[in-house]
């Protein structure tokens, strides 16, 4: 690390401590050239991939847009804010775990549908009907029948 006082490249770490509930590392450093001491803070940079839309355009991941879409599907459904936030965290974790700098928006849509299906099937159908652009009652019926046939359903 460069010394902020003299610009030298050689510094040594004198002390390291976890701060901010373990989310940050505070390091006390000393410049080997001028002897000045200074403090640095390190945090992990967890960047979410950019989205590739169906038309080929690219845009940054927007957590608020994702939250709003899921909240719209969950409107007037018995799902707590905590469960919604856990689902959002799970989606973001899966996106980061891809290791990709860009992902297709279809991937995000499928992750959202998977999480909504676990949270509330009515919300899942609401979201799927818009996301998959259901055109008539038969498409609703087919999706509901598919849900009913899944293992673990009575």
Swiss-Prot record:
Manner of cofactor binding, per the entry note: Binds 1 zinc ion.
InterPro entries, per the entry: ATP-cone_dom, NrdR-like_N, RNR_NrdR-like
Residue intervals of the ATP-cone domain: 49-139
Keywords: ATP-binding, DNA-binding, Metal-binding, Nucleotide-binding, Repressor, Transcription, Transcription regulation, Zinc, Zinc-finger
Zinc finger (unnamed): 3-34
GO molecular function term, any single one: DNA binding
One GO BP annotation of this record: negative regulation of DNA-templated transcription
CC cofactor: Zn(2+)
Pfam families attached to this UniProt entry: ATP-cone, Zn_ribbon_NrdR
Family: Belongs to the NrdR family.
Main function: Negatively regulates transcription of bacterial ribonucleotide reductase nrd genes and operons by binding to NrdR-boxes.
PANTHER family registered for this protein in UniProt: TRANSCRIPTIONAL REPRESSOR NRDR (PTHR30455:SF2)
Protein name as annotated: Transcriptional repressor NrdR
């Amino acid at each position: 690390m460069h010394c902020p006082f003299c610009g030298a490249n050689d510094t040594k770490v004198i002390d390291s401590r976890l701060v901010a509930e373990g989310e940050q590392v505070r390091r006390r450093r000393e410049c080997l050239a001028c002897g000045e001491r200074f403090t640095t803070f390190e945090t992990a940079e967890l960047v979410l991939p950019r989205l590739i839309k169906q038309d080929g355009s690219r845009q940054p991941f927007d957590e608020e847009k994702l939250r709003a879409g899921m909240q719209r599907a969950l409107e007037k459904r018995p799902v707590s804010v905590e469960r919604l936030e856990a689902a959002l965290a799970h989606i973001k974790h899966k996106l980061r775990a891809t290791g990709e700098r860009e992902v297709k928006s279809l991937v995000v849509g499928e992750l959202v549908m998977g999480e909504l299906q676990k949270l509330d099937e009515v919300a899942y159908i609401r979201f799927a009907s818009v996301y998959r652009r259901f055109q008539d009652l038969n498409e609703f019926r087919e999706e509901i029948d598919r849900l009913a046939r899944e293992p673990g359903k009575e």
